Amino acid sequence: MKEVEKNEIKRLSDRLDAIRHQQADLSLVEAADKYAELEKEKATLEAEIARLREVHSQKLSKEAQKLMKMPFQRAITKKEQADMGKLKKSVRGLVVVHPMTALGREMGLQEMTGFSKTAF
C-alpha cells in the first residue's frame, strides 16, 4: 500500500514540474488567464502531494507503533549481532530494527534493537 502513495506522489510531482516549466515559458502579459489557471492547478497539486506525504509517514508510524507495543525490547549486543541467525532461531518472532533504516530513524533508535513477544 505504501507503494501506491509513493507512485502517486511521483506522478503528481512530475505533473507539478511540467506546470512550472510551462509557466516559465508563458508571458504574463499575453497569457495571463492561462498563467492563472496553471497557478491554480499548481496549488492543488502541492496540497495533494503534502496530504499523500502525510499519509505515507503515518503508515510508517503504524508499523513503529506495532513494534513499540511488543512486550519485550532491548538492544542487541555486538556478540549477538555477529551471530544473528542463531539469535533469530532461539527467539521466535524476533524483529530487529537498525537505527539507520527509515523505521529506526523514525523511532529514534540509537542502537540495533530487537522487539519480541517473548523475553530474550
Curated annotation (Swiss-Prot):
It comes from Escherichia coli (strain K12). It comes from the Bacteria. InterPro entries: DUF2810. Gene3D superfamilies: Uncharacterised protein PF10928, DUF2810, UVR domain. It is found in: Cytoplasm. This is Uncharacterized protein YibL. Its main location: cytoplasm. GO terms for cellular component: cytosol. Keywords: Cytoplasm. The gene is yibL. NCBIfam families: PRK11020.1 (NF008244). It holds the Pfam family DUF2810.
